[in-house]
């Protein structure tokens, strides 16, 4: 039969092992690699004549000048979209993707603001690439929650969340 002191040592050892396993698992989760643009490939870049922008929805009409200007540019996102952003206050951006094939407008899933003060010179609050469906919004979404990268995939006509700075908390 084990003495009480031995039982305490065994129990302390088991608790220590559990704490190590839990902290190692938490570290592994927080160290998960960030989504990469290549993991969300888009089709070939669109080179045809752009469709007329759909201005029927009220939000589209409100930003018609920006959206029409964007539709006059070559594709810069997800193969056949032009992603455009504009200011919505001091240190705040919002934007939309214009489908050059259909004229449909898909607004970003919110505004992004409040990014760090000491950002690199090449910092962009909204990052995207021509041959990827991944968008990264760097800062706070809709002026709330954690500051950091928030990843979205353009899929089925909408920006779907992939992962976010709030997932790491």
Each language-model region and where it sits:
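Surface-exposed loop and turn segments in beta-propeller and other repeat-based domains
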Residues: 110-117
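Mid-length scaffold segments of soluble, non-membrane domains
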Residues: 73-110
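Bacterial N-terminal signal peptides that target proteins for export
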Residues: 2-13
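Acidic, small-residue rich beta-repeat scaffolds with periodic aromatic anchors
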Residues: 28-49, 125-169
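Bacterial N-terminal signal peptides
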Residues: 12-21
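Structural signature of eukaryotic scaffold interfaces centered on beta-propeller domains
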Residues: 70-76, 124-131
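Terminal domain-start segments
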Residues: 25-73
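Surface-exposed loop/turn elements that mediate protein-protein interactions on large endomembrane-trafficking
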Residues: 53-58, 97-109, 150-162
């Amino acid at each position: 039969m084990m003495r009480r002191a031995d039982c305490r040592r065994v129990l302390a050892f088991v608790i220590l092992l559990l704490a190590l396993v839990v902290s190692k698992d938490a570290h592994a989760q927080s160290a998960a690699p960030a989504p990469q643009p290549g993991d969300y490939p888009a089709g070939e870049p669109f080179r045809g004549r752009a469709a007329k922008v759909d201005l029927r929805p009220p939000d589209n009409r409100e930003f018609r000048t920006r959206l029409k200007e964007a539709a006059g540019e070559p594709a810069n996102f997800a193969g056949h979209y032009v992603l455009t952003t504009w200011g919505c206050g001091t240190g705040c951006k919002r934007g939309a993707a214009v489908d050059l094939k259909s004229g449909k407008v898909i607004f970003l899933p919110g505004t992004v603001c409040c990014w760090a003060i000491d950002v690199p010179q090449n910092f962009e609050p909204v990052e995207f690439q021509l041959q990827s469906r991944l968008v990264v919004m760097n800062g706070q979404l809709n002026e709330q929650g954690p500051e950091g990268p928030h990843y979205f995939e353009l899929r089925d006509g909408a920006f779907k969340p992939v992962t976010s700075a709030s997932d790491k908390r």
